[in-house]
């Protein structure tokens, strides 16, 4: 199973970028993993939030294959503890050919993307910057991989 993380917009902070790259490399020792970045929309001042979500949604959907399992990182998604995420990921590894996570743009996802999604996860009830979510999520995927393998990274 291949795991893909789709990001809307570049990671601009060099400290976050370094951490994300480090965790992505670590994840790659456990599972095939890649990060795909969809460029941010340009000249959006004249667009409504809905128009922006629709345009970003079209770009997200173009990245998908029909058989992909699509998981949105969304404030309304299920909250899981790290152990639960590991069990969830292990189950998905056995059933999905490509597991695709998406961290959306500043206004969230279009209805078309929500309709296509197989699942939604939330990292917290707290609000994080999109840059921070990328780092926290890659760390959690790495943590889940170490839990699945029974390695000592995670402590209860």
For the regions a language model picked out, list residue spans one by one.
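S-adenosyl-L-methionine/SAH cofactor-binding core of RNA-modifying enzymes
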Residues: 32-33, 37-97
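Short, surface-exposed alpha-helical segments at coil->helix boundaries
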Residues: 17, 21-24, 54-57, 111
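Short glycine-rich anion-binding loops that position phosphate/pyrophosphate groups of nucleotides
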Residues: 11, 75-78, 105-108
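N-terminal beta1-alpha1 ligand-phosphate binding loop
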Residues: 1-27
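Short hydrophobic segments within beta-strands
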Residues: 6-8, 36-38, 102
């Amino acid at each position: 199973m291949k795991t893909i993380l789709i990001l809307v917009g570049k990671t601009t902070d060099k400290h976050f970028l370094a951490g994300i790259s480090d965790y992505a490399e670590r994840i790659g020792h456990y599972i095939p993993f890649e990060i795909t970045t969809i460029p941010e929309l340009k000249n959006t001042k004249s667009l409504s939030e809905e128009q922006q979500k629709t345009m970003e949604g079209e770009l997200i959907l173009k990245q998908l294959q029909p058989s992909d399992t699509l998981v949105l990182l969304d404030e309304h998604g299920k909250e899981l503890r790290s152990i639960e995420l590991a069990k969830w990921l292990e189950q998905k590894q056995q059933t999905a050919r490509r597991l695709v996570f998406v961290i959306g743009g500043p206004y969230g996802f279009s209805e078309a993307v929500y309709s296509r999604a197989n699942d939604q996860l939330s990292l917290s009830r707290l609000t994080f910057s999109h840059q921070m979510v990328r780092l926290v999520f890659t760390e959690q995927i790495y943590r889940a991989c170490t839990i699945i393998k029974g390695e000592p990274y995670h402590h209860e």
